[in-house]
Amino acid sequence: MNYTLLELVQQVTGELGVSRPTLVIGNNDPQIIQLLALVNRLGRDLSRQYEWQRLNTEYSFTTVQGQEQYALPSDWLRQIPQTEWDRTSQWPLIGPATTQEWQIYKSAIISDGPNLRFRIADNFLEVDPPTGDLNLSFYYISKNWIDAGGGVTRYTYAADTDKAIFDDSLMVTGLKVQWKASKGLDASFDLAEFRTMLDTIKAQDKSAQKLTLGGLPRNILLTEWNVQDGSFPS
């Protein structure tokens, strides 16, 4: 179970040897106000660091005939590449298109094809051609790294009971680094510990594919690689 905001700040202040607060949100102590600002920045920075499995989110919607632009989810931080699919036709979307390619799609005499093309521009997912009644789906990384309970997530701490999704030790060490740096203190030891911890937690965050040092597995089926050029058996 992860620390609440209050527990996190109490742990950090205890390790730093400064006064431990009884509340964080609504506290008028400049030290606590600064720690709150720093921990919010820390969480946002960590969100951008990696494809965290707890921030991995699926989104789907149905297209409308003639509509080209569809708003991205409100908590969208970044796209997970090559997850864009047309589930109705069971085809992947083609893209993301560059601006030059998109101009070709919109302007060329012949530009239509059987598959939808897409790009992300101005916080919209744009599709071409604008076909209706298709169920489109993709995965993205959410910017909401705070669990407020009851299925509610946030981008910024709003209550002392809010919890970050990140490892407690990582948050404690990272917050100590930021606090010491803001005070002009030597944070080199804590920074080295934070970087090592971050690499370890990234590696443990989700599963991994099996790697082999041998050659590729042989295909027992007939393919272009194992069919003779001529003189086929009668």
Residue ranges and their predicted role:
Residues 1-234:
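Glycine-enriched, solvent-exposed interface loops adjoining structured elements
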